[in-house]
Design a protein with these regions (language model features):
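Terminal-region recognition feature
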Residues: 1-126
């Protein structure tokens, strides 16, 4: 079965929509990239000075080497709490551990010492 579409890729409307979509997608990628840094340089340095692995390092060490990790909610809490809760303070996603697909939820202590915000709870429960 072939899906039919009325979209005309050569039309001005299509091109305008595509450009707007690509611009919005780039914004989401930039926000997700910034959020992946966690609580900022100072918090990360404090965490490392205590001999602790950073949250994304913990996730990487948990997962099977070379296996994919599909992060969900990477931009959760964006624009909330004065920017103090990147990723809502929790890294969540689907990965592979010993060959099994698993859901991973990792608290990010670099974000306000691991404080849970209302969006953290919402993301965690989702």
């Amino acid at each position: 079965m072939k899906l039919q579409s009325q979209a005309l890729p050569s039309s001005d409307a299509f091109k305008a929509n595509e450009a707007a979509h690509l611009k919005a997608l780039e914004t989401v990628r930039e926000v997700a990239e910034a959020a992946a840094l966690g609580g900022g340089d100072r918090s990360r340095a404090r965490h490392e000075s205590r001999g602790k692995m950073l949250p994304r390092e913990r996730v990487a060490n948990l997962l099977d080497p070379g296996s994919p990790f599909l992060e969900v909610g990477a931009v959760a809490a964006h624009g909330l709490y004065g920017g103090a809760a990147p990723c809502a303070g929790v890294i969540a996603g689907i990965g592979r551990v010993q060959g099994h697909e698993v859901m991973v939820v990792c608290n990010d202590a670099t974000v306000k010492g691991g404080t849970y915000y209302p969006m953290t709870v919402k993301k965690h429960l989702r």
